[in-house]
Regions:
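Residues lining the SAM
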Residues: 46-53, 80
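Conserved catalytic/acceptor-binding region of the Class I
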Residues: 76-170
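Conserved SAM-binding strand-loop segment of SAM-dependent methyltransferases
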Residues: 25-36
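A short acidic, Gly/Pro-enriched loop at the edge of an enzyme's catalytic core
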Residues: 35-47
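A short glycine-rich, Lys/Arg-flanked "PGG" loop and its adjoining helix->strand segment in the class I
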Residues: 60-76
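Conserved SAM-binding motif I beta-strand of class I
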Residues: 9-14
Length: 230
């Protein structure tokens, strides 16, 4: 973004100092918790969040309302989320199998620790409640594995499967221990079956994705206008 818009200032935050050092001079990374009070000295024209499912007790109060306040009138807020539930349109996913069981555990555990794994499906409503206007929503399907006929979706599916496999432990260990008091050995035993079944090409599973963006109204502008997209 810094290279594409050299006249802009790009600020990004993360909980850990994991970002690259070699960046354009107008890009700045800060170690910060976005759930804390935002104390930026200036307003923004564009604020963006992505893949924050499970991070917030309340996306509305901790993020969306702060983003609204931090934007200039006419500025845009955009969120991209893939929710933590698994879907299937043709009954090829076993509802009692290890993949379905793991996703169900993820949803239950995330609610137990008050960090919901369902966020994307609520974004548009949150934007409306906060007061954004000209709200748009696009929904996408993130295939798990290479089962899709479309070449692009097939490639996305392979990458998404690899992403899930790489993150299974990180998604599971602390969450399942805190919610269910499971030991690392018990969790790993469960994950063996999940890894074996996750990319089965006979299973046409996917995860729902949501892209929502809206504009902070100008003074005197009516709020709540929304546009549905695909």
């Amino acid at each position: 973004m810094g290279d594409l818009f050299p006249g802009s200032m790009v600020i990004a935050t993360d909980l850990s100092p994991i970002q690259p050092v070699d960046v354009p001079p107008n890009v700045h990374f800060y170690v910060d918790d976005s759930a804390d009070l935002w104390d930026f000295a200036h307003k923004f024209d564009y604020i963006h969040t992505r893949s924050t499912v499970g991070c917030w007790a309340s996306f509305q109060s901790q993020i969306a309302e702060q983003a609204f306040d931090a934007l200039e009138p006419g500025g845009w807020f955009e969120s991209q989320e893939v929710d933590g539930n698994v879907c299937c349109d043709d009954d090829t996913l076993d509802p009692t199998g290890p993949v379905s069981a793991w996703f169900n555990d993820l949803l239950v555990a995330s609610e137990h620790v008050q960090r919901p794994a369902i966020l994307g499906a609520t974004l548009k409503e949150v934007y409306e409640k906060v007061g954004f206007v000209d709200i748009h929503q696009r929904t996408v399907k993130m295939p798990i594995g290479g089962w899709a006929r479309d070449a692009r979706l097939k490639e996305v599916g392979y990458m998404w499967e690899a992403n899930l496999l790489d993150g299974l432990g990180g998604f599971s260990y602390q969450l399942f221990n805190r919610a269910f008091n499971r030991t690392p050995a018990e969790i790993e035993l469960c994950l063996v079956d999940v890894r074996q079944h996750l990319g089965d090409p006979r299973t046409h599973a996917y995860m729902p994705g949501f892209i929502v963006w809206g504009r902070k109204p100008y003074p005197g502008e009516v709020s709540g206008a929304a546009v549905e997209g695909k």
